[in-house]
Amino acid sequence: MKNEFLGHSESHETILTLFQKHNDDVKQLVGISKTIATYRKYEVTRRHLAEFIRSKYNVSDISIKEISPMFITDFELYLRTACKCGYNTTAKFMQFFKRIIIIARNNGILVGDPFASYKIRLEKVDRGYLTEDEIKIILKKKMVSERLEHVRDLFIFACFTGLAYIDVAGLTQDNICKSFDGNLWIMTKRQKTNTDVNVPLLDIPKMILKKYKGKLPDGKILPVISNQKLNAYLKEIADICGIKKNLTFHLARHTFATTTTLSKGVPIETVSKMLGHTNIETTQIYARITNSKIGSDMQGLDKKFVGIEKIYKEVAM
C-alpha cells in the first residue's frame, strides 16, 4: 500500500504524470483553442502541486488513486500558507487541479470524486474604475512629454473600447473594419479566451486612431509600449492629474464596463459581448453601477408615478 501511495506501483498512474500529459496537450492547442496564459497557469498549478507533494510526503509523485478529500484540503492550506496565495488565487489553482481530477475520473483512473464535498468559491472583488469627471481631468490635462501623451491616449482608447493591454498591442489596420451599419468597428479576438470581440468605435477612439495614422513603424496603429512601462507612466499621470486611485491599464477596461457603458444604459448582455466574456457572471464582477446611474434611473421612475402621486395628494394633503 505504501508503494502505491508513493507512486511506485506500475499499475497506478501518478498525478503529476497525468498533469504533465494534460499540460502538453494544452501547449499544442495554444493559438488554436487555448491561450499561452492558460497554459502557464496550468504549469504553475502543477509546479505548486509538485512542491506540495515533495514537502508533505517527501516523494516526487503519488498515485492518482490515493488523492483523497484530505489531500485536497491539505493542498489548499499549502497554497494559502507556504505559497502565500490570496483567496481567489488559491481558488483558481484549485479549479485547475480539479480539471485534472475530472480527466482522471473520465478515463476510469479514479472512481470516487475527492472534490465531491469541496466547494470552490471566488470572492467578489470590488473592481476600481474611473468616473466620468476623472476621465475628463485626464483628457484636459496638458501632458509634460510626448511619452506621457502617448500613454494617456492608449489609456483613454481602452476606456472607450474595453480592450485589454494584450489586445490593444495586437491591433493592426486589418482589425478596423466598416461594419454592416456603415460605422467603423474593432473586430479582433481576445487573446485570453480566443473569443470574438467586436466593438463599435466611438468618436474619441476614432480621433486617437486618426492622430497616429501613418505615423508609426511596423504597421502599428497605436504607440504601444510594454505593459510594465505603461503602468509605471500611468502612475505619473495619476500624480499630475491629482487622481488618488491606482491607475493601471486594466483599470481602463473596468472603466469601460462601468462608466462608459453600463452607467449609460448599455445592456449588460451587450457589454459582456464587447468585453469578450464567455459568461455574463464575469461581466457582473467587473461592472459596478454608479450612484449617478441609480439616481437618474430613479428620477425616471418617479415620473412614471405622477398619476399616483396626484391621487395621494388629493386624498391626504
Question: For each predicted feature, which ranges?
Answer:
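N-terminal DNA-binding recognition helix of tyrosine site-specific recombinases/integrases
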Residues: 37, 45-55, 81-115, 166
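Basic, Lys/Arg- and aromatic-enriched nucleic-acid-binding interface segment
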Residues: 87, 91-93, 110, 115-165
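Conserved tyrosine-mediated DNA breakage-rejoining catalytic core shared by Y-recombinases
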Residues: 125-128, 134, 170-208
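Catalytic-site neighborhood detector that most strongly recognizes the C-terminal catalytic loop/helix
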Residues: 129, 190-194, 227, 275-300
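Short, basic (Lys/Arg/His-rich) helix/loop patches that form interaction surfaces
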Residues: 145, 215-220, 224, 232-273
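C-terminal catalytic core of tyrosine-transesterase DNA break-rejoin enzymes
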Residues: 156, 160, 166-167, 255-278, ...
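C-terminal catalytic core of Y-nucleophile DNA break-rejoin enzymes
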Residues: 191-210, 215-236
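C-terminal secondary-structure termini that scaffold catalytic or DNA-interacting sites
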Residues: 301-317
